[in-house]
Amino acid sequence: MNSSSKFNFSPLHLNISSLAKHFDKLNALLGLLNLNFSVIGISETRFLKNSPPIFDFDIGGYSAVHTPTESSAGSVLLYVSNHLSYFPRSDLDDLLYKLKKLESVFAEVPFSNKPNCIVGCIYKHPGMSVNAFTAEFLSPFLQLVSKENKSIVLLGDFNINLLNFDNTTEVPLLTPLNLTPCYHRSLYQLE
């Protein structure tokens, strides 16, 4: 990264529901957007454990790190811009993992003039309850990571309807850490 130029950290997340099936659409979308994202998080790549992808999922200008799934759906991937240095945080991947219920992938991006940034992509399968996710996984994870005094960017599909006020148990958990949940349209609605 050229430290003399102004740099904005710009993440993007997409639930792609099979990267093999939608890889061309992803590349077309990135071409249309014509933006240089710092990190692109992809959930539901459907990369299976013990079965390497059968296609080249490289995107020019990015390095990839991923966590496969042992389910028919799921799996997460981070594309990190080649303009950034980073290192995988597999120790954090393990904290947010439950067989066929939850997958995550994390990387840490070091900066010379500000705190490092931990960026992760999380996929919570619909079968895991919101309470189990927040109490058993998200809350302990956030408590641990907040002690590192680094910026945190969490991307992903938590399968929580943020418009349903009965499911907002995670919002008070995020607020003290200055994390803000965002809601955007799903690819299913855009197809």
Predicted regions and their residues:
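A shared catalytic/ligand-binding motif for oxyanion handling
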Residues: 1-191
